Amino acid sequence: MAAEIDFLREQNRRLNEDFRRYQMESFSKYSSVQKAVCQGEGDDTFENLVFDQSFLAPLVTEYDKHLGELNGQLKYYQKQVGEMKLQLENVIKENERLHSELKDAVEKKLEAFPLGTEVGTDIYADDETVRNLQEQLQLANQEKTQAVELWQTVSQELDRLHKLYQEHMTEAQIHVFESQKQKDQLFDFQQLTKQLHVTNENMEVTNQQFLKTVTEQSVIIEQLRKKLRQAKLELRVAVAKVEELTNVTEDLQGQMKKKEKDVVSAHGREEASDRRLQQLQSSIKQLEIRLCVTIQEANQLRTENTHLEKQTRELQAKCNELENERYEAIVRARNSMQLLEEANLQKSQALLEEKQKEEDIEKMKETVSRFVQDATIRTKKEVANTKKQCNIQISRLTEELSALQMECAEKQGQIERVIKEKKAVEEELEKIYREGRGNESDYRKLEEMHQRFLVSERSKDDLQLRLTRAENRIKQLETDSSEEISRYQEMIQKLQNVLESERENCGLVSEQRLKLQQENKQLRKETESLRKIALEAQKKAKVKISTMEHEFSIKERGFEVQLREMEDSNRNSIVELRHLLATQQKAANRWKEETKKLTESAEIRINNLKSELSRQKLHTQELLSQLEMANEKVAENEKLILEHQEKANRLQRRLSQAEERAASASQQLSVITVQRRKAASLMNLENI
């Protein structure tokens, strides 16, 4: 019995120590949670504390049930021990009373019994009965000593049990007081756990919403990356098209330079033909002067013919020769006049053709320059517009992303503040529950804490509303971005149509160029016939050509500088676009790293929770094994109690048998005393 009670006490002490240790661990975790929250690291420990408290509630209920059962068993055993103690006291009192009565009766009988020889055989019979009675008394005394020894052992055990009971009662009272405190604390913890469960559910909902928003933002970012890739491809295509257009413009400029060179050569040839015509005109004028001189000489000769008829005959031959020469000169003059007229006609035709060609060339130059300028202006404007729009969109998206990040950071800060305030409220509530509930200031503090809690819940609701607004805003941004992307696609299609139209115009220009080349070939054929005449004028024209080449080289340098500036501007724009793309890629990589960090932290939390679940399962298994051991020990204690009850019943039976024997012995003693009294009375009568 004592060993069982010691075992129960040790088991109870172990359970109390485990419970206190677990409670201290929970409080230490709670304090570490508060410190971590103050330092900004209180998410995992807070969830672990909530999980521990949620897991602690059924253990505490089972522990309370087990304590109630043990208290009931202790009360039952105490009742049985009290009853047994009363029965033993009654038995001891009756034994002492019977022993004293027997002792008194025997002493009285022995004193009253005379030692004479007159009795004879009766005395011998009485001696035999006395011997029997003495043997019975010895046996009764032995049983009495055994019963006294048992009574002493039982009394010692009862004293020890009484002491243990008192100690256990003190410990039980302390434990009851502690259990009441623990129940109050558990009730408070249960309320706090309920509140924390609600807050955790809300936090889980918010975390799920945040994860949804993060996934949606990641999807949006991937879509934007795809769109950026498409935009890069389109920009590359546009750059390739611009390069093609620049190549086409360079080809057109080269063709224009060739045409200008052809025009310059045609001008030189025309100038040479003009000079040749001037020379022919000067020769014709000289011939005319000669004709005038010859006419004057003829007049003089005619005047002299009258005077020199004699000499006419002599000079007829000379006159005939002169007439022949005159005829030849007239023929030559006529031929020269015809040549002059043909040259004038050719000159006029050439001038007309040159004017037409110059007009056509000027028109072509104007059209080509307009076309090139329009194309360059359009491409520049479209590239600038697309660049500006892309920059505006990128800046707007970056600003919106930064604003959303700031809002998320602010919301996270507000959530952390709410958690800190809630934990401060919980600390104050714990302090208030520890200090008691008697003062009005505590009630005021409770009301203030309740108001703070309501304010925190309102702020939480406001944060949820802001999150919904942010999600709606993100959806609006997605719709706006999709609309802008569709608009940019339409603009790109328009640009492609414009490029196709410009290609068609370039085809028309190439056809016109072919026509002009054919006309230039014809002009070359015509100028080849005039080259023979213009060989003399080429020497003079070389100087002018060199000057014109110098001028054209200067113009070419200017055009090259302009082209370089255009290329530099295009390169700068490409560098800027690459820089923007690099920044976007960096931002995307940063988002990827952040999402990876979040996923890793979530996985770490999940692993921690799994490890804690496994640890708690092991702890529950250990507690269940301990409970099974305790139940087994309780069953063993019940068996021992039953054995002790059987032993007590045996002792009661022995006591009842001893009482019966004492009663029979007292009856026999009373019979013997009666017989002795009768014998004494008879002896007295005989003496009388």
Curated annotation (Swiss-Prot):
- Tell me the domain of life: Eukaryota
Q: Name one GO molecular function term.
A: clathrin binding
Question: Which keywords appear in this protein's UniProt record, sorted alphabetically?
Answer: Acetylation, Coiled coil, Cytoplasm, Cytoskeleton, Phosphoprotein
Q: Which cysteines are joined by disulfide bonds?
A: none
Write out the GO biological process terms. Answer: cilium assembly; clustering of voltage-gated sodium channels
User: What InterPro entries would the database entry show?
Assistant: SCLT1
Q: Which residues carry this modification: N-acetylalanine?
A: 2
Report the protein's function: Adapter protein that links SCN10A to clathrin. Regulates SCN10A channel activity, possibly by promoting channel internalization.
Could you describe the subunit structure of this protein? Interacts with SCN10A and clathrin. Identified in a complex containing SCN10A, clathrin and SCLT1.
How is this protein named in the record? Sodium channel and clathrin linker 1
Origin organism is Homo sapiens (Human)
The UniProt gene name for this protein comes to SCLT1
